[in-house]
């Protein structure tokens, strides 16, 4: 099966990004043909500084490769290196109803807040559909709140088929594990919007300080506690093995257990868990030419597939 996933280069990944999405879709490279792209064209709707965008794109590539994306198993490339995608966007846009775009979440939310939504945001779902259809993608891993994008993609492909005949592979959404929601430093869902994230990469000492400042309740140390209702324990579970998790749960239930101990434990297991990725990233940072070669090779393969798909679309709609 062919899997497609994109990551926006708009900021550095945090624990929630990793466990809620990145790890899950990287795992799909083992038994599928993976196409993973860095969505720099999409990022232009929010990132307007050229140097920042260039830096973000390279950081996204370094992050994905360090976290386990294997270029011998999957194709990693930059969205703007595939001009066929922007051409396909136009072919799809000529048959896209305005009402469909007006109903899409991102546009509706921005409009509801009284913010100005530009044409880039308005037509964002069409570019996303082109991203998916250009590679004959069969599986697209998404969060529950992103399923609408796949539905829109299928609708646009269906409209094109109705007008010009069968052309595209219709993708299916693979919903990511909703149980993989990661609590932030304040106990809410980890999100940049809440300013409660813990980064995957960065100074270990600084991250440890952030962990030690995680908000807890004011229950006395001697009181027994329910581990399943505690966000520090939920973080610990992400990294520790079954035996370690059970031992920690028993300490919670027994009482006489301070939050300082679990904070130190979270810091230790998370540092150990991400240590190989941090080492890999440092290695890649010292050899950026290799990273560029990986992106170029991924783009070469992606263009071969996209060119074939767009050629079908051109012929079917009368441009060839």
UniProtKB/Swiss-Prot annotation:
The keyword Flavoprotein does not apply. It catalyses: tRNA(Trp) + L-tryptophan + ATP = L-tryptophyl-tRNA(Trp) + AMP + diphosphate + H(+). Catalyzes the attachment of tryptophan to tRNA(Trp). GO terms for biological process: tryptophanyl-tRNA aminoacylation. The gene is trpS. The lineage of its organism: Bacteria, Pseudomonadati, Planctomycetota, Planctomycetia, Pirellulales. A motif ('KMSKS' region) lies at residues 189-193. Its EC number is 6.1.1.2. A motif ('HIGH' region) lies at residues 9-17. NCBIfam families: trpS. Keywords: Aminoacyl-tRNA synthetase, ATP-binding, Cytoplasm, Ligase, Nucleotide-binding, Protein biosynthesis. Belongs to the class-I aminoacyl-tRNA synthetase family. Homodimer. It is an enzyme of class 6 (ligase). This is Tryptophan--tRNA ligase. GO terms for molecular function: ATP binding; tryptophan-tRNA ligase activity. L-tryptophan binds at residue 131. Its main location: cytoplasm.
């Amino acid at each position: 099966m062919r899997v497609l996933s994109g990551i926006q280069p708009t900021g550095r990944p945090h624990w929630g990004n990793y466990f809620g999405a990145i790890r899950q879709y990287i795992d799909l490279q083992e038994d599928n043909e993976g196409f993973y792209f860095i969505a720099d064209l999409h990022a232009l709707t929010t990132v307007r500084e050229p140097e920042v965008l260039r830096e973000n794109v390279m950081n996204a590539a370094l992050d994905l490769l360090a976290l386990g994306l294997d270029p011998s198993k999957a194709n990693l490339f930059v969205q703007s290196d595939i001009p066929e995608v922007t051409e396909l966007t136009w072919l799809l846009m000529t048959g896209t109803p305005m009402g469909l775009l007006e109903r899409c979440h991102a546009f509706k939310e921005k409009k509801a807040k009284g913010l100005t939504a530009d044409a880039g945001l308005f037509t964002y779902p069409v570019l996303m559909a082109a991203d998916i259809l250009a590679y004959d993608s069969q599986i697209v891993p998404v969060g529950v709140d992103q399923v609408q994008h796949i539905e829109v993609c299928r609708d646009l492909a269906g409209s094109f088929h109705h007008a010009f005949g069968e052309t595209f592979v219709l993708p299916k959404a693979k919903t990511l594990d909703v149980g993989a929601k990661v609590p932030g430093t304040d106990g809410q869902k980890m999100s940049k919007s809440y300013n409660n994230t813990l980064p995957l990469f960065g100074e270990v000492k600084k991250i440890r300080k952030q962990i030690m400042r995680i908000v807890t309740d004011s229950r006395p140390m001697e009181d027994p506690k329910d581990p399943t209702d505690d966000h520090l324990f939920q973080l610990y579970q992400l990294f520790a093995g079954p035996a370690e998790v059970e031992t920690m749960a028993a300490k919670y239930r027994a009482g006489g257990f301070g939050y300082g101990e679990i904070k130190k434990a979270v810091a230790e297991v998370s540092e150990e868990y991400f240590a190989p990725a941090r080492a890999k990233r440092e290695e890649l940072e010292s050899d950026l030419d290799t990273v560029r070669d990986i992106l170029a090779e991924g783009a070469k393969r992606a263009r071969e597939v996209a060119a074939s798909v767009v050629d079908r679309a051109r012929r079917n709609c009368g441009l060839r």
